[in-house]
C-alpha cells in the first residue's frame, strides 16, 4: 500500500497538469486595476434542440481546434476576451455564474486562467450578452 501512494500522487499531478495544458490558446484574464478580470457575461442561446444541441468549447479560437467540452442553451459564462468570431470564456461546471471562478473582481496583471473553473473558446454566434 505504501508503494502505491507515490504512484497515485504522480498520476494525480500529471492529470492536473494535462487539464491545465488542454488549451492550445490560453484564455487571458485580468490586466486592469479597476475592472473585473473578465469584462462581461453571457448566456448560451439559439442552439437547435433538433440539431446536435450543444455549443462546442474549443481549445483555441477556431473550428480546427480540439473540442474540450460542450455547453447547452441557458448556460451562463464569463466573456474574458475575443479573437475574430470567437470568445475566450470562463465557466463553471454547473452552467451558472459562480463566485468561485474568481473573475468578477479585478486582477491587476493579465495572465492565463488556470482555474478553479473551466476555460475555453466558443463561437460568438451562440452567446447572448447579459452583463458588462
For every predicted segment, state its role.
Residues 21-42, 90-132:
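Boundary regions of SH3-family modules and the immediately adjacent low-complexity/disordered segments
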Residues 84-88:
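Short aromatic-glycine-enriched beta-strand elements
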